[in-house]
Amino acid sequence: MWSKIRSMMEGHPERLRVMRILIENGLGLRGNEVYLNDIEVPVVRIAKSAGVDRRTVDETIRMVETNPELKSLFSNLRSAGLSLRGVAKQLGLGVVEIVVEDPHKPGIIAGASQLFSEMGVSIRQALVDDPELSPEPKLVLIGDKQVPGEIIPRLLKIPGVTRVSVY
């Protein structure tokens, strides 16, 4: 879907930035309004985040409203909810970010989960970007304690994994 959106926005990089902000933050559209689940978000805040003016956000919303496929997507988009990533350090949790060459390849989550289990780390949260909606999808696993650094080379042996970061 993301490649289709990029194609539709060719020649309008500022509108593409607006759409990216909406998708990455799970912001949906209802009529001419932007929502974070049930909370209305002022378009001026979206504009500031995307580095565009308010009119560009309004134009993008109008364009989405006239395209049935985009309207269906954005009218049903909702935030996935709470992420522990930003507070992991304060809570004594470990964070592992995994990037893969082909996000459609099965077995990445299973392989990573197995390694966490072998190291005695319970997964508190798994966050996976949708490869159809995110231009740079990642898998983020948050463990119940700090994740040992020796997991990195083992994760890199999982077929398809190209980069691993432990925080």
Positions of PLM-derived features:
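Active-site/ligand-binding neighborhood in enzyme catalytic cores
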Residues: 60
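Helix-turn-helix DNA-binding elements, focusing on the entry/boundary residues of the two helices
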Residues: 43
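Short alpha-helical "recognition helix" segments of helix-turn-helix
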Residues: 46-47
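A conserved regulatory-domain signal marking ACT and ACT-like small-molecule sensing domains
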Residues: 2-33, 63-167
